[in-house]
Amino acid sequence: GTRPSLTTTVEMFKPDKWGSTFFFVDMDYAKNEVASAYWELARELKFWKAPISVHVEYDGGINYIKDSYLAGATYTFNNKDFTKGFSASVMYKYIHSNPSPNNFQFTATWYLHFGQGKYSFTGFMDFWRERHNSGNGKSHLLTFLAEPQFWVNLNAFPWADDDFKLSVGTEWEVSSNFALMDGWYLN
């Protein structure tokens, strides 16, 4: 199977005194309409100083995407001025309506802001267990997905107002056995 080549993403990350909330919504387009949609909502809970937090997450979408519920622990590192950092999460993953619903997932995220905040290199990497079939019917047990992103942060330029919080950028997808695909792909 092939996936649409155009995807739009809306995302939000918001830290607070009890941890942080992150969500995103992806919509893939075919012809002139949305062909599929997917979203994740994740919460880090932390009532202590250590860099470990409790992670809870919901993932879901339309078409071939099954609802998933995840819980685990996250280690987070940020440097003092928050120009670079990473996190690593180890989670139990329950995939609703899957013949083998009890699974695991490892997720790593990173960010690097440079050029006086004008540019950012961000992304994530997921590795999980999920019994599924590719579009050609081949059975798979493990999936890998990484999406490095490069952003131009428009509010960091002198001509933009500080409240103009808009970034434009690009994303690459490196995957193995993801969605209906069979084997390794770079999109």
Give short role names for the model-derived ranges.
Residues M27-K31, Y58-I62, F77, V90-H96, ...:
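Transmembrane beta-strands of outer-membrane beta-barrel pores
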Residues V10-K14, L41-L45, A71-F77, V90-Y92, ...:
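Residues on the lipid-exposed face of transmembrane beta-strands in outer-membrane beta-barrel proteins
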Residues R3, Y29-A35, F47, P51-I52, ...:
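Signature for the C-terminal beta-barrel architecture of outer-membrane proteins
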Residues E40-H96:
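Gram-negative (and chloroplast) outer-membrane scaffold detector with strong preference
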Residues N98-A179:
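Outer-membrane beta-barrel transmembrane domain signature
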Residues P4-T8, A35-W39, I65-A71, S100-F106, ...:
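Residues that define the transmembrane beta-barrel architecture of outer-membrane proteins
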Residues W18-S20, E44-V54, N78-S87, H113-F121, ...:
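Short loop/turn motifs that connect adjacent beta-strands in outer-membrane beta-barrel proteins
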Residues G1-A30:
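Short glycine/proline- and aromatic-enriched beta-strand/turn motifs that initiate or cap beta-hairpins
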